[in-house]
């Protein structure tokens, strides 16, 4: 039943929004657990299947691209402790999903968690938001920015922001882990190439990881925050409709059309953001969110 919000005060709107949000918070989001661990297992399975000729390399490449594109969001849930909070008996599972799901893209959970919390705290701040570097007027310029980030000499904004926290043991450890992850990936690729699997290394790991990261930055970072102009809690993220449609289009953007709900209520798991949005939509619009057709 839709609420008439036209005569509600700001305090009443805030109370109604919180009451709706509470209905979608809680429980273990098992879908994200299966997604994160299952996606990693599928990617690992590609290697023996392709190397033994059971699966053609071109098919392995397509699956690997999908694996890389799916690698981040389960870790994202873990970053917010949505699988299990501190002190919960399943906290180990939260951390396992956080670490394992992003192994294919060679990004450590520690650095992703720190920078993502900074993103939430300073969304769209040019100096403090680690994701502000994804700012671009158009989607293809955003993709091009990502391509440029793959070039030699590129300065990673995540590293820059963490280096400013020099002396912080958590930040120092995250930077060390990031170096070890990248070094490990390079050594693994060199070893595979030296062993006669250069094409497999390129098409099952290196190239899919670049494609997946570009897709993730476009859908998870650029699209929900463009034009990156405002910093208010209800103005720094938008609700939007991809190509004017829902259904398959929402799947292709991995639910990011409802990313405004995540920024307002990060304890709501990804797959509940849509239902939560539609229930609180009128309230959010009354509170001034940018709504591009959703």
Give the residues covered by each predicted segment.
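Histidine-centered catalytic micro-motifs
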Residues: 72-81, 112-124, 220-227, 252-268
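Juxtamembrane/interfacial segments around transmembrane helices
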Residues: 87-95, 114-118, 144-155, 228-238, ...
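Membrane-helix boundary/juxtamembrane motif in polytopic membrane proteins
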Residues: 167-173, 206, 229-243
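Transmembrane alpha-helical segments that form the membrane-embedded catalytic/substrate-channel core
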Residues: 66-78, 108, 206-232
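A short, ordered amphipathic alpha-helix with a cationic face
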Residues: 89, 177-178, 249-251
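Non-catalytic, topology-defining segments of multipass membrane proteins
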Residues: 1-65, 74, 99-207, 269-294
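Long helical/loop segments within the catalytic core of UDP-sugar-dependent glycosyltransferases
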Residues: 66, 245-256
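Juxtamembrane helix-capping/reentrant segments at transmembrane boundaries
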Residues: 81-107, 127-141, 231-246
